[in-house]
Amino acid sequence: MSGISSKGLEELKNNGWLILEDGKKIKKEFKFKDFKQSIDFLKDIQPSADALDHHPDVCIYYNRVIVELTTHDMGGLTDLDYKLAIKIDELYKMKTSNL
């Protein structure tokens, strides 16, 4: 398992991910119409997280979903965080393209 390249980090930042804790964690807030859409989004994330065996920390505040990613056992960011972040962004674009 390797870390995220500087190019990968730059891509994530350009997509709205915040780099936290000196590059050990990434975080992004996703906004929806209502609570149901927030919950549905989390359900959409679950299969991808399971497929990668890499699960985000998530907080839901009615119509907002805050996702944080880090690889706890590596003490920072890895390619798993990058892959899941990119997938989450794709899912969000698909979910919100009809709003």
From Swiss-Prot:
Listed GO MF terms: 4-alpha-hydroxytetrahydrobiopterin dehydratase activity
A GO BP entry: tetrahydrobiopterin biosynthetic process
Keyword line: Lyase
Catalysed reactions, as listed in the record: (4aS,6R)-4a-hydroxy-L-erythro-5,6,7,8-tetrahydrobiopterin = (6R)-L-erythro-6,7-dihydrobiopterin + H2O
SUPFAM superfamilies, per database record: PCD-like (SSF55248)
EC numbers: 4.2.1.96
Broad class of enzyme this protein falls into: lyase
Record family assignment: Belongs to the pterin-4-alpha-carbinolamine dehydratase family.
Classification via PANTHER family: PTERIN-4-ALPHA-CARBINOLAMINE DEHYDRATASE (PTHR12599:SF0)
Protein name (database record): Putative pterin-4-alpha-carbinolamine dehydratase
Species this protein is from: Saccharolobus islandicus (strain M.14.25 / Kamchatka #1)
